[in-house]
Amino acid sequence: MSTIKKSGIITICGRPNVGKSTLTNALVGEKIAIVSNKPQTTRNRIYGVVNRGDTQFILLDTPGLHKPKSALGDYMVKVVTSSLADVDCALLLVEPIPHVGAPEKALIERVKEEKIPCILCINKIDTVEPAELLPVIAAYNEAWDGFDAIIPISAHSRSGLDDLMQELQKYAQEGPQLFPDGETTDQPERQVLGELLRGKLLL
């Protein structure tokens, strides 16, 4: 019998190549999303499923935030913004750079409009010294002082992921299990294999 009593729908947003797919794969525990150094490798929302204790998390891995330059790019940006509808929490994933760009500011404004809890995740902390994170945190706090939490992580090395999952527990809602035990994605197996092959071709 399932012990799941709560669920949380979490959308992961950020610029291309900031590590959204790496984070999704790390939290799920297997590779369901493309990881590539080429931008816009995730074209649709990918649902990852993570069971932790009595809670089931549904992760929405979205395309990267960018200024669209094509019909496909425009569609991908719409996927990002639509993913903020009916979620319990948004993760803004950023690199450890002390600058808040236009894409991040636009997402912050959308989160404020929707009144969605938002966690700032500073990724790739394994590439900088701890002291270098302070100006990054200061820059984002200056842009918006409404983040519900700021959590430094490394999706690659898994550093900080336990802290992140513990924070996400706060936003889970009482309710039924949405996906069966053992299911890690809503994507058909054939589509997952196709996406992973596409990821290899993009490397």
What are the roles of these predicted feature ranges?
Residues 51, 56, 78-150:
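Conserved C-terminal guanine-recognition region of P-loop GTPase G domains, centered on the G4
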Residues 116-117, 126-189:
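Canonical P-loop GTPase G-domain recognition
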